[in-house]
Amino acid sequence: MAAGFLFHMGSLPAIATVGHKSKVLVIGGTGYLGKRLVTASLAAGHETYVLQRPEIGVDIEKIQLLLSFKKAGASLVSGSFNDYRSLVDAVKLVDVVICAVSGVHIRSHQILLQLKLVDAIKEAGNVKRFLPSEFGTDPATMENAMEPGRVTFDDKMVVRKAIEEAGIPFTYISANCFAGYFLGGLCQPGFILPSREQVTLLGDGNQKAVYVDEDDIARYTIKMIDDPRTLNKTVYIKPPKNVLSQREVVGIWEKYIGKELKKTTLSVEEFLAMMKEQDYAEQVGLTHYYHVCYEGCLTNFEIGDEAGEATKLYPEVGYTTVVEYMKRYV
């Protein structure tokens, strides 16, 4: 198994029968990826529930988003990580639980809150599949990650261990680089819009990474939830046309704007020195950039038979290529 832990099915229910559309609960449904998961679940015809957490308070944008989900056919369920019984009651309503709470320190790092959700799912006993908040780099491949960024991977592995020891059926999704964060800034940390003048290359700019449109991540995720081929496996989303280096991404942008950007380079030593000057949350994120852009951690291994790859499992799903994605910035 990709996660490296033994799996015991125990007394939990078997996977849904072929043709059955599971009832889905999305936790973190107002977040950057979560809102896309809700939309994709509804579009695929699943009875969809969204956890409405009181912690939202008077955040009008999130409240309006929840109301838009309700209008589109979703059911809102009150619940909180601070109220264990509410979690148990919420998961009892559905077959599949998808958690999309933030694992990004510059927003809010909530990965270990999922341990409460694991306990709730175990007690409820009806959940056929749990998809925890992963969606980035596969933490099982990052055992040698640097501090402080390794905390993200370590915490995700703690959650995986709890899931598997509880005998909860699962799917772990490694979606690599969110396109909005990486492509928009031409793979430069701290940028989300592409410059028309200059770009800083990380190292030689030739390390390959994998970029995935966030809407595609959501669509592939929903395809997996009733698929027995993805049960108790890690599934990578690795669109073949989207495995590109920073230089290749920059080249695509240069073709769109009809000019070459002024290029400077940032050596690994300069990057690490710059990283140490940032606060803790920034250092965590920059560590991830280091592993992706200097070490090529997303493409330096082969996907084994014990795992799966979404574009091969679902060739009927047309994914957004980097070339197509970049056009929106012109």
Swiss-Prot record:
Binding locations of substrate: H288
GO BP term, example: (-)-secoisolariciresinol biosynthetic process
Methyltransferase in keyword set: no
GO molecular function, one term: pinoresinol reductase activity
Top-rank EC class of the record's enzyme: oxidoreductase
Tissue specificity of this protein: Expressed in leaves, stems, leaves and seeds.
Residues given in the record as NADP(+) binding sites: G28, G29, T30, G31, Y32, L33, G34, R53, K62, R160
Active site: K156 (proton acceptor)
Keywords annotated in UniProt: NADP, Oxidoreductase
EC number: 1.23.1.2, 1.23.1.1
The reaction(s) this protein catalyses: (+)-lariciresinol + NADP(+) = (+)-pinoresinol + NADPH + H(+); (-)-secoisolariciresinol + NADP(+) = (+)-lariciresinol + NADPH + H(+)
CDD domains: PCBER_SDR_a
Alphabetical list of SUPFAM superfamilies matching this protein: NAD(P)-binding Rossmann-fold domains
Known partners and oligomeric status: Dimer.
Similarity annotation: Belongs to the NmrA-type oxidoreductase family. Isoflavone reductase subfamily.
Function: Reductase involved in lignan biosynthesis. Catalyzes the enantioselective conversion of (+)-pinoresinol into (+)-lariciresinol and of (+)-lariciresinol into (-)-secoisolariciresinol. Abstracts the 4R-hydride from the NADPH cofactor during catalysis.
Name listed for the protein in its UniProt record: Bifunctional pinoresinol-lariciresinol reductase 2
Phylogenetic placement of the source organism: Eukaryota, Viridiplantae, Streptophyta, Embryophyta, Tracheophyta
Name of the gene encoding the protein in the UniProt record: PLR_Lu2
